[in-house]
Structure formats: C-alpha cells, structure tokens
C-alpha cells in the first residue's frame, strides 16, 4: 500500500509498493527495437567467465566499502573454485565472512545484514545445496518487499551445473526452482560480458538476486569451458557503471538480440 514507507525495521527507508511497480514497468527497461548484438570472442587478451565475476566482486567491494561483505563457506581459502582470490589479492580479506556448513544460516545472515542497511553478497557453494536454504530464500528474503514493504539488497551467487564430476548435490540446475517467485530476481549470465554487467547491476538492486553461475563456463580448463570452447571476451567495464550511476537499468529486464531470425529454439 502507498502508506508503507518503512521496512520491518525503522533503520532504513524503503520504497512504497507503487514506487516499486512503477520502476518495474518503466519504459527505459524494455525496448522493442533492440539492436543486434552478436557475440564476439577473442583468442588472447580477454577475460574468462570466472575472471569477469572476480573483477565484478572486487569492483563491488571498492564501490560499497564497509557496507559490503561476502558471506559463505570456505571463504578464507577462496571458496571451492578460488573465486574469492581476487578479493584477497585486492586487500578485501576483512570482508570475507566464513560461515558454518548450513545454507539456511548463510542466507538468513545475508538477509539480516541487508535489513541492517548493508549490501551483502552471499555464496551457496553448489546449486543443489540451495534446497537447504529454500525456506530462507523463498519464505523470508523473497517476501520482504511485498509482505512488509522492506528492501533486501542481497545478491546470492550460486555455482551450479555439471562438468566437475562432483556427484549428487553438486551439479543440479536450480533455475526452475526459483524462476516463478515474484520476490526474487533470477539471473543466469552466459558470457563474461553478461556476467560482469549483471553482477554489478545486481549489487545495486534493492531486492534479493539469485546469480546463477554455470561451473562449466568458468574457464577452469586452461581458459576454456568444460566443453572445450573459448568464450573469452574483452569486457567493457564502463557502460554498466555509467548506467547504475544514473539510476538506469543496463541489462536486467532487457533482451539482447544476438542473431536474426523468426523462431526461438
């Protein structure tokens, strides 16, 4: 209702439901005349998918300062895939919050941190383990906006998918579990450029974002995907920052047309 001006705590102002719906329906989000943006990969001098995510995390830590922390398992040893190594190398060791092996606690800690006015980035180490944090994600984080009128600026990174030979619980594709929840923003970047842009933008949203990273795309095999392909790109890091500084949407909610045609497969 329009009378809702505070969240569940009185510490932070929250947008009204009307303001939020107006932002979602804003004409600057979706354009029916989007230009064709073909995918371009480079053999040298580009970033892998993992490198783009690492750089985005460092840039987010630099931008948000003390308001940003990174919460998850094995954080002190850079996580299961070394994704936190760039944060450590950039001097952000103190922002890494190591948690017990309990996804519910990890997500709830992120929610509490977000409600206090910070912008946490949470990691669920493998997709299958998101099931153990399902209640915290769906019945708590996702409901804060529409049930209590609260902001919950939290990004949840989730490595998922096959190509690790890690067995059950480590290869689940979980996007369908959460895609229909109206309180969650679900992102699944497919290229280094998309990964950088979407993670930067996600960190500026006032709602919980599930950021799904396919492990096979990381570039762990000599810079190539788990299928032996090169998807490395020279990543433009300026455009998304320009958009968020102006309060504009950059990629979230917009479709990229990468090839011409009449059918979607």
What are these regions (language model features)?
Residues 96, 255-258:
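Generic preference for hydrophobic/aromatic residues in regular secondary structure cores
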Residues 3-226:
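Thiamine diphosphate
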Residues 259-265:
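Short, intrinsically disordered, charge-balanced linker/junction segments flanking boundaries
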């Amino acid at each position: 209702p329009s009378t809702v001006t505070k969240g569940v705590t009185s510490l932070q102002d929250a947008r009204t439901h009307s303001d939020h719906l107006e932002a979602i329906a804003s004409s600057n989000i979706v354009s029916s005349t989007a230009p064709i943006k073909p995918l371009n990969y480079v053999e040298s001098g580009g970033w892998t998918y993992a490198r783009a995510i690492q750089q985005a995390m460092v840039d987010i830590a630099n931008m948000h300062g003390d308001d940003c922390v990174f919460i998850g398992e094995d954080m002190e040893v850079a996580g299961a895939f070394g994704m936190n190594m760039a944060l450590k190398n950039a001097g952000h060791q103190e922002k890494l919050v190591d948690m017990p092996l309990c996804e519910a606690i990890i997500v709830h800690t992120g929610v509490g941190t977000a409600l206090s006015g910070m912008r946490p980035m949470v990691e669920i180490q493998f997709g299958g383990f998101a099931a153990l944090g399902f209640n915290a994600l769906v019945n708590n984080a996702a409901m804060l906006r529409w049930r209590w009128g609260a902001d919950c600026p939290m990004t949840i990174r989730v490595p998922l998918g096959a190509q690790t030979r890690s067995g059950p619980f480590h290869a689940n594709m979980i996007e369908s579990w959460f895609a229909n929840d109206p309180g969650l923003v679900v992102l699944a970047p497919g290229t280094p450029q998309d990964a950088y842009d979407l993670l930067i933008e996600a960190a500026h949203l006032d709602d919980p974002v599930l950021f799904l990273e396919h492990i096979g795309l990381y570039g762990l095999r000599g810079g190539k995907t788990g299928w032996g392909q090169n998807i490395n790109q020279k990543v433009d890091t300026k455009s998304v920052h320009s958009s968020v500084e102006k309060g504009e949407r950059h990629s979230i909610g917009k479709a990229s047309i990468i090839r011409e045609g009449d059918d979607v497969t």
